[in-house]
Amino acid sequence: MVILKQQPNQLTTIIKRDGRTAMFDEEKIIEAIKKSFQATGEYQNYTYYREICSDVMRVLFERNISVPTVEQVQDMVEEVLMKKGHPHVAKAYILYRAERSRIREMNTRLMQIYEDITFKDSKDSDIKRENANVNGDTAMGTMLKYGSEGAKQYYEMFILKPEHSSAHKDGDIHIHDLDFLTMTTTCCQIDLIKLFKDGFSTGHGALREPKYISSYSALACIAIQSNQNDQHGGQSIANFDYGLALGVKKTFIAQYLDHMIQSLGLIAEYDDAESIKQIHKALLKNGAELSIVNHISFMALELAELKKLGINENLIEKCQQYSLKNAIKSTDRDTYKAMVALVHNLNTMHSRAGAQTPFSSINYGMDTSAEGRIVIKNILLALEAGMGNGETPIFPIHIFRVKEGINFNEGEPNYDLFKLACKVSSKRLFPNFAFVDAPFNLQYYKEGHPETEVAYMGCRTRVMGNVHDPEKEITYGRGNLSFTSINLPRIGIKAQGNIENFFTELDEKIDLCCDQLIERFRIQANKKVRNYPFLMGEGVWIDSENLGPDDTVEEVLKHGTLTMGFIGLAECLIALTGKHHGESAEAQELGIKIVSHMRKRVDEWAQNMKLNFSLIATPAEGLSGRFIKIDNKLYGDIKGVTDKEYYTNSFHVPVYYNTSAFEKINIEAPYHKFTNAGHITYVEMDGDMSKNVDAFEKVIRHMKETGIGYGSINHPVDRDPVCGFTGIIGDKCPGCGRDESEFPFERIRRITGYLVGTLDRFNNAKLAEVRDRVKHNM
């Protein structure tokens, strides 16, 4: 015992992991030993823990280790615990040691990330360009990244199951929006009609039900902004035309009344405006309809009432015709102004602590009422006009619904609006086109029920089917809860051409993803209405209007989707067969087999759990570079697979592959029916498409005829901010002849569904992808 008491004096310093020396502190060793005993349920007294510590120091001294490293001390603790008959405690100590190492490693990694965020400009930091909709150089953009990266690492360490955490970290799967794991859901299709009825609140006082189209427009922007602050993804208005048509109708009524008051005063010299207002109010209250199309009955009743006031019948009729004509004209003008304001607002207002412009989408095209047509026409004209200096608006993402009988063929009520949509998209890249007649969309459509019309989020997300409640297979008030993507190329590489082995591992990863989605859902389900003051508190999410502030949201969240995605089908097929699906019929057959199998498996999960598991063609932005970077380190350069900076998005034909627009559509169309959580097909066209709208329309028509669910056409949209020229700009501006040495040209390009006005915001992988994009001929 005398020797044991003397040993501590022999060790005075220790070498830490970073190479620095520090004072030797035996109490730290004793504390670690104590925790290891407690972890196994074995308890000893302090004297015994100290005795083990003394044994450790004695062995170090006997081995002539006078200045040990931390690792040497820990090795010796394990050895002494085993010799003293405590194998379980030794195992607990090993786990404790491993956990401490993991925390240290995570801490070091996080600090390195924080250093990049703090001291590097976004052009030198890929992590600050992870999302092109966030300006990583601003104070709020930087703060958002601090919180995001810290949250991700905390969840990896303490919240995720170890198997989910390691699969994500190692690049087998990718848990999207991991920074919001314990907080909220992804996105929602907002029903403006329901939200605006009787008004709503954003937390600082109530907003009345809007009465004019300008108010409808402003409140639509506020709804998008407010809901985005409750969710981590984008926001979409499912019924933009139907919803704002009510505002047009109210505006027409107000305009007609104003013009009647003015004209009766001027022509009939009747100046009692209050009496005219009371007549209108009474007629409307008693059910008389006054609208752009249906006004004859109202005007007859109005005529009778005004005659009672002693006004000449001929003068009344003259005033009515004047008021009708000018009310329609004024309503159209005011609607255009409101749509211009909406476009400007959604490109200038901010959400999420000022770091982002709301990621917004609007769906329209099917409302054939006069008021709905005015909305559709004027939102398209506002988009065509652009921003203040003619710039192409980045938001909202416009989605024009296409359907036979409504707008696809000549003679149909909204055919002129489809033609206008093609014209505007050929200039501004929006709108995109959603095809209601695609079989997997048409199966839900019920005429006269707009809530059954398919609606997409801008990037591609789709919510329609509902195994939780088949009576509510609608778009309104529903959205995605979360999604996780599989690294298909890696499974293809590991299979080494063995298809059976490929599907075996694919099934393992599918089950892993679905299990992770369930874990995340359980966290989300425990949230309360008060955690989502707008989304749930204002009844935006389906059925949430029936809940109180302290109710949990589990039941209503079951209407949402739990989504598995995939990336790199093309590279996966190259790894398995040597060719991708664009260049080989056999590869295409295998590709369809792979994606249909994935859909079959998520459908099984959906039926077993009675939750809406679904499959998405992943819109990878940061992920396209993340997976391939990890795989390149593991497997090196594999031709056509890991020898570039990005994996190809979802089921797309590689961007570098030369093919025609029609052929690309033909190849990708079969995959749309399997990806029920979302999909999109793009083609890249060359030249100024605004000068060849007929060719543009032919491509859109081919998409519809081949069963595409959602599609769009990419083409160059450049602008010189100096002279204002908009079109295709090479090295020099065709408008003024200058180059961009002093002021760069604006080059609008699409990234994972939305537009970006400068390539500076693209991450390295997406920059490489844009460079590789080839044009598709007709």
Model-derived segments and spans:
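Conserved catalytic cores of very large enzyme subunits
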Residues: 99-103, 109-558, 579-580, 584-747
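Charged, amphipathic alpha-helical regulatory modules used
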Residues: 2-117, 768-774
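Conformational switch/transducer regions in large eukaryotic molecular machines and scaffolds
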Residues: 25, 43, 731, 753-754
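Contiguous, well-ordered alpha-helical segments that form the cores/surfaces of helical PPI scaffolds
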Residues: 562-575, 596, 750
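Long insertion/accessory domains within large nucleic-acid-processing enzymes
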Residues: 734-778
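Metallocofactor- and cofactor-centric catalytic cores in central/energy metabolism, strongly enriched
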Residues: 333-337, 344, 575, 763-770
